[in-house]
Amino acid sequence: MCIRDSHYAEATGLLLARTGLSPADVAALGVHGQTIRHRPQKGFTLQLNHPALVAELTGIDVVADLRSRDVAAGGEGAPLVPAFHAECFTGDVPRVVLNIGGIANISVLPARSESPTILGGDTGPGNMLIDTWTQRITGALYDRDGRWAASGRVSTTLLDNLLSEPYFALPIPKSTGRELFSPAWLDARLCGHESLPPEDVARTLVELTARTITNTVARFAPDAAELYVCGGGVYNKTLMQAIASHFPGLTATTEALGVPPMEVEAAAFAWLAERFLASLPGNLPAVTRAAGPRILGALYPR
C-alpha cells in the first residue's frame, strides 16, 4: 500500500514540475485508491490507499474515501464519473460516454436542451476478464492492441453461456466488480468449452465486453447520436472495432472532446475533490440509487 501511495506522490511531483506549479498552488488531490472490495448491498466499499501518507509526501491536502458516503445513503457508490461526464461532455445532441477500465460503465447524457435526467451504470466486465485470460495463457499483462484476440474467432456457444449471467439483464443503475466477474466466474463459464483454442476464448471475451456494452446502450440510450470512449480499453483495437461495428459512424474517443482517454477518470476524481472542498454534492442519485445528493469524501490535511 505504501508503494502505491509513494507512486501517487511521485506522479504528483512530476506533474507539478511539468506545469511549473508548486504544492501551494494546488487546493487538494483527489485520491481514489484501488478498490479491493465493493459490496454496497452489505453497506461497504473498500479502497486500498494511504491518503495521510500522500498528504505528507506531497505537502498537499488530500480528499479520499469518495465512495462510502454514497453507500451510506443507500447508494451503489458507483459509478461516480457520470456527474463529471455531464459537467464536461454534455452537448447539443444526446451522447453516451463509455469508460472501459476493468469494469465498463456508461453515462447517458441528454442533449443540453433536453431533460437534465442522467442515467449511468456498469455494463459488466471491461478489460478485466480479457486481461485475466491473457495473463493466464500468455503471461503478458494484457493483450497489446487486441492482437492475440484478433487471431481467434468468436464461439457463439461460449458467448451465449457468458451472456446468460443474470447481471446483464438488470436495468441501470447498477454496479459490479471483481466480486462477481472473478477468475472463478470465468472458470465456471468455461466448463464444457475446454476444447476451444485459447485465442478463440480471448476473442469471445472481447465480444462479451462489446456485446454487453452495446446491448446496454441500445436498451437505455436508443436515441444517442454520439458515443465517446475513454479508459484503457480504447487501446484494444479489436474491442474498439467490435463496439464500432454496432454503432457505425457514431464512435470516437474523448480526445475528440478535448480530453485524452486516459485522463478522463483522473480528471473526474479531481473534480469530485473540488466539489468536496466547495461543500457541493458529487453523486447523482439517479445513477447510484442513493437517497439523495451527498458531499463525497474525507479530508486529510497536509
What are these regions (language model features)?
Residues 1-6:
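Conserved small/polar residues in nucleotide/adenosyl-binding loops
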Residues 35-52, 239-244:
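Short Gly/Thr/Asp-enriched flexible loops that form oxyanion-binding sites at enzyme active sites
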Residues 40-45, 52-56, 60-141, 295:
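Phosphate-binding/catalytic loop of phosphoryl-transfer enzymes
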Residues 115-210, 214, 278, 288, ...:
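Conserved ATP-utilizing enzyme core subdomain
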Residues 244-268:
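Conserved phosphate-binding/catalytic loops in two-lobed NTP-binding clefts
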